[in-house]
A protein has these predicted regions:
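N-terminal acidic leader/helix
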Residues: 2-36
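Short, charge-rich amphipathic interface segments used for partner binding and complex assembly
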Residues: 23-71
Length: 71
């Protein structure tokens, strides 16, 4: 059966995709933190990179929030 494409379906798919992206960014930030602990010499760079990942996550959350508020 073919699923009818509606505005509501599209919004739900966007929400699901954004949630998946946020989950992936969380995992990436955690992984970078763990790598930093293993390689203390590179810890400063890892912390900077982890901060960038967290900033990207914040932007993703803002985008999702904006989409939800626009409904």
């Amino acid at each position: 059966m073919i699923e009818e494409f509606t505005h509501t379906n599209a919004q739900e798919r966007v929400r699901e995709d954004m949630a998946s992206a946020i989950t992936a960014l969380d995992f990436l930030a955690t992984s970078i933190g763990r790598l930093a602990a293993l390689h203390e010499a590179d810890e400063e760079d890892a912390i900077i990179t982890e901060g960038r990942v967290i900033a990207a996550k914040r932007e993703m959350v803002k985008a999702v929030t904006g989409l939800l508020e626009a409904e």
